[in-house]
Amino acid sequence: MPVNLPLPQADNLKPVAGVELGWAEAGIRKANRKDVLVVRVAEGSTVAGVFTRNRFCAAPVQVCRENLAGGKGIRALVINTGNANAGTGETGLANARATCDALAGQLGIAANQVLPFSTGVILEQLPMDRLLAGLAPAIANAKADNWLAAAESIMTTDTQPKAASRTVQIDGKTVTLSGISKGAGMIRPNMATMLGFIATDAAVAQPVLQALVSHAADHSFNSITIDGDTSTNDSFVLIATGKSGAAIDRADGPAFEALREAVTSLAQELAQMIVRDGEGATKLMTIRVEGGKDVAECRQIAYAVAHSPLVKTAFYASDPNLGRILAAVGYAGVDDLDVDRVNLWLDDVWVARDGGRNPEYREEDGQRVMKQAEITVRIALGRGNAEATVWTCDLSHDYVSINADYRS
């Protein structure tokens, strides 16, 4: 069961002027499920993205990078689930481009104005006949208020759709943002089997939009982990249609800061939804490391704790075996760390003080916190002013079962 994750309600998801979303049941891997999504984007919109750092990146990621760099103006996105089109060689690359060609032909745009995305099983070729047959019905039911159905159509091992909206006032105009995400396993973005899409009706210059998507990714999708694996297909895309009339043409000033905060907070909500729905997750842990020399070492330590199977299983068992956290801090790779200055809290419970057990710590207090569904682990390094936060989940028996049964 997801951790404190209510189902999104269609009425709470706001249309974004200039964006229409349509889905189809193409039977790419399983019958009778939404598995193709087409997103139509108004002419004149700007689009920016960040993608997986996995060197074995999937064919659609390569095509996305090419088409974004082409500067023709993106007019459509196409996403399929059930097949990652990764590890598929030249045939997979040709299939990704053929998908763009087919959608472009039906929409009357150029092929390099389409961004393709895939998620699912690696090392299998796309069933192109089924995928291409799904494009026309997806286009036919494209509507501005299809955000919930869109979220459903990009799910793989997710147990529920992930979608959210925001509005923000910029220069006296109401700016709307809506987004969807998917992912439940192989999540340690940089990115990881994670897709995220946010659209806004602000008018944003392309370089500014790229700065926005990069900042939002660093503070959201690149700050979560479920199992430490980095996928071949991760993508996070930001669309700005300009339909609200609120214009942002430089990466500073109050208007930029307001939109950056809105985009980042929405991305954080979508990213945390992924962790809350992590495969087999029963708890959400916030790992906050402070007092570091720089953000990089804080994040390095936070990820060491978040990735530790011993830490994650202790949280699953509600077992306050908290020396495991200190051990992870110690092997994180910060060679000049003075462990005698390290302090550790679970929520408001001070567990370790100056590198050792806090004399006032009682295990029953740690046990009380460990039984909660949401827990904050705070680690103070005592060597600077930098900080970083990572979100993760526990590791349960169900994680093994879900992944063992994934292809069956």
Swiss-Prot record:
Annotated site location: Cleavage: 192-193
Active site (record annotation): 193
Binding site for substrate: 156, 182, 193, 279, 403, 408
Residue ranges of coiled coil: none
Native organism taxonomy: Bacteria, Pseudomonadati, Pseudomonadota, Betaproteobacteria, Burkholderiales
PANTHER family attached to this UniProt entry: ARGININE BIOSYNTHESIS BIFUNCTIONAL PROTEIN ARGJ, ARGININE BIOSYNTHESIS BIFUNCTIONAL PROTEIN ARGJ, MITOCHONDRIAL
The enzyme's E.C. designation: 2.3.1.35, 2.3.1.1
An MF annotation (GO) of this entry: L-glutamate N-acetyltransferase activity
Catalytic activity field: N(2)-acetyl-L-ornithine + L-glutamate = N-acetyl-L-glutamate + L-ornithine; L-glutamate + acetyl-CoA = N-acetyl-L-glutamate + CoA + H(+)
Main location: cytoplasm
Name listed for the protein in its UniProt record: Arginine biosynthesis bifunctional protein ArgJ
GO (cellular component) term, any one: cytoplasm
BP GO annotations: L-arginine biosynthetic process; ornithine biosynthetic process
Pfam family, one: ArgJ
Keyword tags: Acyltransferase, Amino-acid biosynthesis, Arginine biosynthesis, Autocatalytic cleavage, Cytoplasm, Multifunctional enzyme, Transferase
Site features described as Involved in the stabilization of negative charge on the oxyanion by the formation of the oxyanion hole, chain residue numbers: 119-120
Similarity remark: Belongs to the ArgJ family.
Subunit structure: Heterotetramer of two alpha and two beta chains.
Gene transcribed to yield this protein: argJ
